[in-house]
């Protein structure tokens, strides 16, 4: 399945999970005050700008050099398209899943990352600030600047951020920082004699999150 088809699948999966939880709510246990349910504001959707600083300790050359000839670091820019569902609720935090498709490019190279992960968000601090963290895994598809080939490899990412409530259904994502790793395309994948380590991904993002329903 091509990654471009995963975006509508992402939205469908989120709404399916939310609908199932709403149809099958768990009663609140007074002794623990923890419960599973999806209520108003527990589903969030976002399309936010992102910058990813991609580094690799081993320089590469030729048409399959992902970062460019003899280059070990480069900024890539693009967008995070995704959403989350918080379905587990505790007096001190909420937890759920986040699905995202991160599409970035730089120097005519491209990285497309489809990630699924668990997230935990603290109850609002000072009523409106909501710090969160998540661990995601998935598939990273990289394309070098001078070739049409794509390499699909396992990718992981660790993220932390801060959302601020602007309105009933709108949050401002003040910042999200991330660190991840993926094996990007290189000359070593095409009969090259040099092996290349995974590329490291340092990301920064922000924008708006629309909470539904």
Predicted features by range, described:
Residues 79-147, 151-156, 205-213:
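Gram-negative (and chloroplast) outer-membrane scaffold detector with strong preference
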Residues 56-65, 108-114, 143-152, 184-192:
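Outer-membrane beta-barrel translocator domains and adjoining extracellular loop/strand segments
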């Amino acid at each position: 399945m091509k990654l471009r088809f995963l975006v509508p699948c992402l939205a469908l999966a989120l709404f399916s999970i939310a609908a199932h939880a709403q149809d099958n709510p768990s009663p609140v246990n007074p002794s623990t005050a923890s419960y599973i349910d999806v209520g108003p504001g527990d589903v969030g959707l976002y399309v936010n700008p992102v910058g990813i600083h991609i580094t690799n300790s081993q320089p590469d050359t030729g048409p399959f050099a992902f970062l460019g000839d003899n280059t070990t670091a480069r900024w890539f820019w693009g967008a995070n398209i995704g959403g989350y569902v918080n379905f587990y609720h505790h007096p001190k935090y909420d937890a759920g899943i986040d699905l995202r498709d991160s599409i970035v490019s730089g120097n005519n190279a491209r990285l497309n990352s489809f990630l699924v992960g668990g997230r935990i968000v603290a109850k609002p601090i000072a009523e409106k600030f909501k710090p969160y963290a998540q661990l995601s895994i998935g598939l990273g598809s990289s394309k070098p600047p001078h070739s049409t080939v794509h390499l699909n490899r396992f990718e992981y990412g660790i993220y932390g951020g801060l959302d601020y409530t602007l309105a009933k259904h709108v949050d401002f994502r003040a910042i999200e920082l991330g660190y991840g790793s993926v094996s990007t395309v290189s000359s070593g994948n095409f009969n090259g004699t040099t092996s290349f380590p995974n590329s490291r991904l340092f990301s920064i993002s922000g924008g708006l999150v629309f909470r539904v329903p």
